[in-house]
Amino acid sequence: MDASVDRITNLHFEILAKAGGHEIHQKYEAIRKLNLTGDSSKSNISVSARSAILKWADAKQGYIASQLDDRDYGDLIAKAVIFVPMSVITGGKNPKDLIPYGVVAAVLIFVPETLTLLDEIVINLMHDKKPLSSILLTKILRDMKIDVCGSNFDSFYYCPISRYNRHIIKLAGALPQMPTSVRLSVNDLARVAISEVHNQLISDKQMFFKLPTGFSPKVHCLKVLCTTEMEIFQKWVRTFMSDRPNEFIYSDQFNILSRTTYFSSDDPFSFFTLWRGWSTYKEILSQDQASSFLEAIGSGKPLRSSIATFPSMFDEGAIYIRYEWITPKDSANSKKAGSSAPSAPKM
């Protein structure tokens, strides 16, 4: 599928600059104002900046090394702003794992998972190759009037794929010629969609930190159903909450229907959620492309289901989570069959 780079750029500018712009400016200001050496490191401005970075570090949105005053920094770039997809953190990495060599203080800025759709698209610079995703970030920061580098800090993008022989990609100051369109595969669209749902469940509900009663990661797989349509989701919620109110709990804030009873491997699902990123996809794709994507993840299709993992905090190791889509076509088929309510598919 060919998608317009201008549409993708404008969409991510809306998300990063307009929705999250205040936080981005705050994090850049803290990195700029943090002084590491001399009397200036003890000024009220620097101490306040250090306090802010420590708070972000507690929320897994930053990193600051201990005993900063005892270090010899020389000519090292010792501070950094790192843009990273949330899936990197929910996949088990800690902020410290993302820090470039020599950096002792950093803040993380989470980017939409849809930005990773551009990771495979290589932009050739004079002596380097960078993913289009990092170039797009540079352009957005420039439009936000933010310098990507300073005398003692740099900006980076953590690229999840290993195509560039490194994951930490330094944001370039100059902007190369941008392509007018990019080709996106349905498989990548499905992968990113699952990443978004996975992030929702982990960051919004924290549900994988406490295992359901009777669930063992060694032998069981959590099952999550997700849908692109609010109408389908609301119908399911009404049905299960009215028919079996003691088995489920619904979070209107996070759009998640959770099973509360003892875990059984025969249950068709453990959680049912609305994928909120569908509106983002509809901005990137044409109507025909969006329909093709829904067809590809429909009933009986190879992209119907996907397995993700979450690092368990217990001795059992990783938790395996199976995600499966419920599309408008599935709902229509249910109506044709004469069903008065949607039925959970067998998994």
From Swiss-Prot:
InterPro entries: Phytoreo_Pns (IPR008777). Keywords: Host-virus interaction, Inhibition of host innate immune response by virus, Suppressor of RNA silencing, Viral immunoevasion. Pfam families: Phytoreo_Pns. It comes from the Viruses. One of its GO terms (biological process) is symbiont-mediated suppression of host innate immune response. Belongs to the phytoreovirus non-structural protein 10 family. Suppressor of RNA-mediated gene silencing, also known as post-transcriptional gene silencing (PTGS), a mechanism of plant viral defense that limits the accumulation of viral RNAs. This is Suppressor of RNA-mediated gene silencing. It comes from Wound tumor virus.
